[in-house]
Amino acid sequence: MSPHRETTGDESTTTTVPQNGTNGAAAPELVAVPTNGAAVKAPETLAVQNGANSRVKPIQRSSHLVAADLDGEFDLICVGFGPASLSVAIALHDTLAAGKKLRPDGSSPKVLFLEKQTRFAWHAGMLLPGAKMQISFIKDLATLRDPRSHFTFLNYLHQHDRLVDFTNLSTFLPARVEYEDYMRWCSAHFEHLAQYDHEVVSVTPAVKKADTVKLFAVEARNNVNGQVQTFRGRNIMLATGGKPSFPKSFPVKHPRILHSSQYAYMVPQILTDKNAAYKVVVVGAGQSAAEIFHNIQNLYPNSSTQLVMRQEFLKPSDDSPFVNSIFNPEYIDALFPKSAKGRSEFLVDARATNYGVVRLELIEELFERMYAQKRVLGPDERTWPHRIMGCRQISNIEPHGDRLEVKIHGLSDGVVNSADEEILSADLIIAATGYQRNAHIDMLKSTWEMLPKAVPGTAMFNKGVTGWNVDTEQGERKLAVGRDYRVQYKAGSVAGDAGIWLQGCCEGTHGLSDTLLSVLATRSGEMVQSIFGTEH
């Protein structure tokens, strides 16, 4: 994670989540979460847990967006109910609250959110004690689009009687657990529109008229009973978040190998003795890796930890004001028209804002810890309990009982040096190695035939800077989106009042802010405009 690496996706798939108090004083406690099946009727009011003082405040659900018959036709189905979809719900509410029409007859649009998690949660696995947000609270789910919205972070504070006290903190960066609580407060207004424990498996054309698709079918598996249910909608928005990514050298699955997205709630279950001398290997060079490396040492004072990374050293993130402008909403308009080569060069040049970088304060604290070990134990790092192992790569992992044998090789100019080998023993390996954001490709497989033919593949295309190539029986096709995030199907194949939109997987065309929180408020307004058009 970098200063902007507050991603929008929901990567956790567990049915238990940590209780998020805003004091962040201890490791998260595990609590059981009730499942929300398709047949559960939403109450008129909902209650959310306010982490500041454990008060429960009633939340009135949105009166502008009403629940529709699940067997009917929806105007919009959102796949995923994380921050991206939540911001769209807020934009819809605000548009209607302002007296504008989204349907010709002025009625409320029929909207449905399908979410595989048991309830709304944002990065539950990385809500660490003391962790701060890395973007300003002004870039919340509403302010940059409409500062008067009910759903601003400042109004959340006001509703919970903390606005003055928060002001006295003199910061733009709230605690991460408080910001997650803010988003859960927002989501509580729309719980009646969400079907949790529903994992979407496919989106297919459902109704055609003269070879033009008028309606799509969304198939979702109920994770409680395993049944597959079909929902129908004119417009479909895919906002599925990222899938945890592991290095190729890692076993396919092992109970003592975790992804950083599982950290906060899985580690206490595996490493149960706070005083034990556990050996933990953390893999990665970004903010999440550094935070976990730091946090393990605090939680388990007798542990030994190794931070293994291909980079030579931890690098600070660049969050200077001029560089920060690439996360401004208007920068998307400057980037999208560029050539594939221009966008590719931009992504490489801007990596220091978002990938493989760490906040300077944390780097300085970790360096101080490494220095203290050197001062007390001497220069031989192999005698230190905590090591940052740069220019290293894990080549192999072998299970040995309850432990893992980790074979590490040094890198020379990016190439593995077989002579530089070290074997570590680990009770736990945590991979802070990012996410894959390509679930939409297979999810839309049944629509590939409607895509235009692809120009012979180039290296640029593989980076997603112009889209994605897919192989069909009729040859290679091009899956790409327009400036409004709408999938570009062949002319006439999809009706003008129907379509599919992508969120959180368009970094190659729309910039580094695409997977982040930075532009959600303004982008959601654009999405509503694109899907529902101007006021009727």
UniProtKB/Swiss-Prot annotation:
Entry keywords, A to Z: FAD, Flavoprotein, Monooxygenase, NADP, Nucleotide-binding, Oxidoreductase, Virulence
Catalytic activity entry: L-ornithine + NADH + O2 = N(5)-hydroxy-L-ornithine + NAD(+) + H2O; L-ornithine + NADPH + O2 = N(5)-hydroxy-L-ornithine + NADP(+) + H2O
Chain ranges passing through the membrane: none
Binding site for L-ornithine: 139, 324-327, 354, 518
Gene3D superfamilies the record matches: FAD/NAD(P)-binding domain
Region described as Disordered: spans on this chain: 1-25
GO-annotated biological processes: biosynthetic process; intracellular iron ion homeostasis
Keyword Signal attached: no
Pathway(s) served: Siderophore biosynthesis
Disulfide-bonded cysteines: none
InterPro entries recorded: FAD/NAD-bd_sf, Lys/Orn_oxygenase
Gene Ontology terms for molecular function: monooxygenase activity; nucleotide binding
Binding-site list for FAD: 115-123, 134, 200, 515-517
Binding sites annotated in the UniProt record for NADP(+): 310
Keyword Flavoprotein among record annotations: yes
Top-level class of the enzyme under EC nomenclature: oxidoreductase
EC number, as in UniProt: 1.14.13.196
Names of required cofactors: FAD
Family classification: Belongs to the lysine N(6)-hydroxylase/L-ornithine N(5)-oxygenase family.
Assembly behavior: Homotetramer.
Protein name as catalogued: L-ornithine N(5)-monooxygenase SIDA
